[in-house]
From Swiss-Prot:
Residues 1-17 form the signal peptide. The keyword Secreted applies. Keywords: Disulfide bond, Ion channel impairing toxin, Knottin, Neurotoxin, Secreted, Signal, Toxin, Voltage-gated sodium channel impairing toxin. The presence of a 'disulfide through disulfide knot' structurally defines this protein as a knottin. This is U2-ctenitoxin-Pn1b. It comes from the Eukaryota. Its main location: secreted. The keyword Kinase does not apply. One of its GO terms (cellular component) is extracellular region. It comes from Phoneutria nigriventer (Brazilian armed spider). GO terms for molecular function: sodium channel regulator activity; toxin activity. It is found in: Secreted. It holds the Pfam family D_CNTX.
Length: 115
């Protein structure tokens, strides 16, 4: 019984340390903790998933200089029930992104949409 408790404790510690490491990687960019929720835009999961996705590439290329109007004219959020708005990315550039309320629609949701 004691051996089972020890093994279970080791597994829990291993899982916790992995979660901590992932958290550190997420915030390893400079000034990541200083940014507000509205300034942070998630990136695509991988280059392979993005390579053929016109919708994602279109949104990444679209610059809007802080104005929502160009975004509303050029993107449709790939059928998601959201709105296309202009937001400051972690790169310090304004980009068109899709959001539902205060939640950014993740890039992987846009990956299935091709215009």
């Amino acid at each position: 019984m004691k051996v089972a408790v020890i093994i279970l404790s080791i597994l829990v510690l291993a899982a916790a340390s992995e979660s901590i490491e992932e958290y550190r990687e997420d915030f390893s960019r400079p000034n990541a903790m200083e940014r507000s929720a509205n300034d942070w835009i998630p990136t695509a999961p991988s280059a392979v998933e993005r390579s053929a996705d016109f919708a994602v590439e279109e949104l990444e290329r679209a610059t809007c200089a802080g104005q929502d109007k160009p975004c509303k004219e050029t993107c449709d959020c790939c059928g998601e029930r959201g709105e296309c708005v202009c937001a400051l990315s972690y790169e310090g550039k304004y980009r068109c992104i899709c959001r539902q309320g205060y939640v950014w629609i993740a890039w992987y949701k846009l990956a299935s949409c091709k215009k």
